[in-house]
């Protein structure tokens, strides 16, 4: 079996040893190399799962590909669910990439709730992870938010499971090719109308040509450093957030002068305080809050639909009446 090539992979061993094999799961099966490899991997690890395939009808071949996947799953004795949303031309919308993703995740969530699946396996690999990290760098993400995708994360209250994040794409393809396993070549993955495709087809090859080396591993290393930084920041932040109290105006975060000596941590504490109230603060907003705290001046600021009151010794998110 093709996945025997990875039977000594310690990260995979650790991942699967943490799973409850008595439960049943979903596998997002596109038919591409990544999800197909993951299908065989799950079979080899005795995971009980159902494959779900979403056929958007974007390609002339997609109907036949869905039928072929159904036949393959029947041959492999894997339960199979086929979903065909209302057809949409991928060229008609600038946001079709994100819209399709939202549709899939809502479908996965609904299936998990209706059929009692414990989580969804996704075939994201190391190259996908590197793309995610570089995209976040260019978007100006906080250093603590450059960790990329997590191997296990909750989507609402459904687990998203990504065991392949450390495995490069080429190793997955080599494993399938060496065993003559056919997989779908999705041409939309190369359609440069989509940002991910432009990064994959143009940006990454260009950067690797300029630097003369693979840039995936340094990006993954950056993600690891970011994850460690995030863990440290969360540990340092927790005691300050425990001091949050309700007063006559709303939620109050007391700020001590000692905290203000470390601007990086002070702004992170404020950022998490706002997030706990479902408010996303920009870097410029956090800097403004910090500046007022440092000078001891009072300010009333707007953050989405809420009023934030900054005073000499604290930050208040005012209640909505």
UniProtKB/Swiss-Prot annotation:
ATP binds at residues 30-35. One of its GO terms (cellular component) is cytoplasm. CDD domains: TilS_N. It catalyses: cytidine(34) in tRNA(Ile2) + L-lysine + ATP = lysidine(34) in tRNA(Ile2) + AMP + diphosphate + H(+). It is an enzyme of class 6 (ligase). It holds the Pfam family ATP_bind_3. Its main location: cytoplasm. GO terms for molecular function: ATP binding; tRNA(Ile)-lysidine synthase activity. One of its GO terms (biological process) is tRNA modification. NCBIfam families: lysidine_TilS_N. The N-terminal region contains the highly conserved SGGXDS motif, predicted to be a P-loop motif involved in ATP binding. This is tRNA(Ile)-lysidine synthase. It comes from Chlamydia trachomatis serovar D (strain ATCC VR-885 / DSM 19411 / UW-3/Cx). The lineage of its organism: Bacteria, Pseudomonadati, Chlamydiota, Chlamydiia, Chlamydiales. The gene is tilS.
């Amino acid at each position: 079996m093709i996945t025997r090539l990875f039977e000594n992979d310690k990260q995979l061993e650790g991942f699967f040893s943490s799973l409850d094999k008595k439960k049943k799961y979903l596998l997002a099966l596109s038919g591409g190399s990544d999800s197909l490899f993951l299908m065989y991997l799950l079979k080899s690890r005795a995971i009980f799962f159902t494959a779900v395939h979403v056929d958007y009808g974007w390609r002339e071949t997609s109907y036949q590909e869905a039928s072929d996947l159904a036949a393959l799953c029947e041959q492999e004795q894997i339960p199979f669910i086929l979903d065909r949303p209302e057809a949409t031309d991928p060229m008609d919308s600038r946001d079709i990439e994100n819209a399709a993703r939202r549709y899939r995740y809502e479908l996965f969530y609904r299936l998990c709730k209706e059929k009692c699946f414990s989580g969804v396996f996704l075939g994201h690999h190391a190259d996908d992870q590197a793309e995610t990290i570089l995209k976040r760098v260019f978007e100006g993400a906080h250093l603590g938010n450059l960790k990329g995708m997590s191997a296990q994360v909750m989507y609402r209250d459904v687990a998203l499971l990504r065991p392949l994040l450390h495995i490069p794409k080429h190793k997955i393809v080599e494993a399938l090719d060496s065993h003559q396993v056919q997989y779908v070549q999705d041409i939309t993955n190369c359609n440069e109308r989509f940002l991910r495709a432009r990064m994959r087809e143009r940006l990454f090859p260009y950067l690797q040509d300029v630097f003369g080396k693979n840039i995936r591993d340094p990006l993954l290393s950056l993600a690891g450093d970011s994850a460690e930084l995030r863990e440290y920041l969360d540990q340092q932040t927790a005691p300050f957030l425990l001091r949050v109290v309700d007063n006559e105006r709303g939620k109050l975060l007391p700020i001590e002068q000692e905290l203000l000596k470390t601007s990086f941590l002070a702004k992170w504490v404020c950022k998490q305080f706002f997030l706990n109230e479902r408010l996303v603060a920009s870097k410029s907003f956090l800097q403004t809050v910090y500046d007022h705290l440092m000078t001891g001046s009072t300010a009333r600021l707007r953050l989405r639909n809420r009023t934030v009151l900054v005073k000499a010794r604290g930050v208040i998110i005012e209640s909505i009446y």
